[in-house]
Amino acid sequence: MSIRVGQKAPDFTATAVFDQEFGTIRLSDYLDKRYVVLFFYPLDFTFVCPTEITAFSDRFKEFKELSTEVLGVSVDSEFSHLAWTQIDRKSGGLGELEYPLVSDLKKEISSSYNVLTEDGVALRALFIIDKEGIIQHSTVNNLSFGRNVDEALRTLQAIQYSQENPDEVCPVNWKPGSKTMKPDPVGSKVYFEAI
């Protein structure tokens, strides 16, 4: 199944680890009032993955201020997730996280988002899902390099701005407070004349 921006995000129910406990997560429970940053990573106890997972946790408050939940997903079991969160960061673990890690042991979530490799691990994919459950943004990195949390936040802010201001669009490198433009031949000239 191919999944694209503008389509409904595949719902899922799965076991997750949060606050050193197991719980059930359903994507649709997060929607209606909040956006969701759903990111996939290859495996627990690896090398690039903890740098991304902890970076999202360290910046979680900024996502929360934007009415956004963060969910991390890998094909590991909830037991593996729990063990990894019980190891401190300086020893290659995750320590306490501000958001749940979802277990996709059966690889159903990774498959439904079309991010599963032939080797059976998820690529470094990130989806920003709006309150209506529509995928507004997706990126997929290969396994050997991590994502940019600043860019995820900036993209989220641009999505929210454009949804709140449907008569405007956000040009390259847009950040809150930057100029936007009207998406028409006359209105866009105001933007281009100012740069």
Swiss-Prot record:
Presence of keyword Amino-acid biosynthesis: no
Localization (cell): Plastid, Chloroplast
Protein name: 2-cysteine peroxiredoxin, chloroplastic
Gene3D superfamilies linked: Glutaredoxin (3.40.30.10)
CDD domains: PRX_Typ2cys (cd03015)
Domain Thioredoxin: 3-161
Pfam family, one: AhpC-TSA
UniProt xrefs under PANTHER family: THIOREDOXIN PEROXIDASE (PTHR10681), THIOREDOXIN-DEPENDENT PEROXIDE REDUCTASE, MITOCHONDRIAL (PTHR10681:SF128)
Entry keyword annotation includes Plastid: yes
Any one GO cellular component localisation term in the record: chloroplast
High-level lineage: Eukaryota, Sar, Stramenopiles, Ochrophyta, Raphidophyceae
Summary of the function given for this chain in its UniProt record: Thiol-specific peroxidase that catalyzes the reduction of hydrogen peroxide and organic hydroperoxides to water and alcohols, respectively. Plays a role in cell protection against oxidative stress by detoxifying peroxides.
Catalytic activity: a hydroperoxide + [thioredoxin]-dithiol = an alcohol + [thioredoxin]-disulfide + H2O
Induction: Up-regulated by high-intensity light and H2O2. Down-regulated in the late stationary growth phase as compared to the early stationary and exponential growth phases.
A molecular-function term among this protein's GO annotations: thioredoxin peroxidase activity
Positions of the catalytic residues: C49 (cysteine sulfenic acid (-soh) intermediate)
EC number, UniProt record: 1.11.1.24
Keywords: Chloroplast, Disulfide bond, Oxidoreductase, Plastid
Family: Belongs to the peroxiredoxin family. AhpC/Prx1 subfamily.
Subunit structure: Homodimer; disulfide-linked, upon oxidation.
GO biological process assignments: cell redox homeostasis; cellular response to stress; hydrogen peroxide catabolic process; response to oxidative stress
InterPro entries: AhpC/TSA, Peroxiredoxin, Peroxiredoxin_AhpC-typ, Peroxiredoxin_C, Thioredoxin-like_sf, Thioredoxin_domain
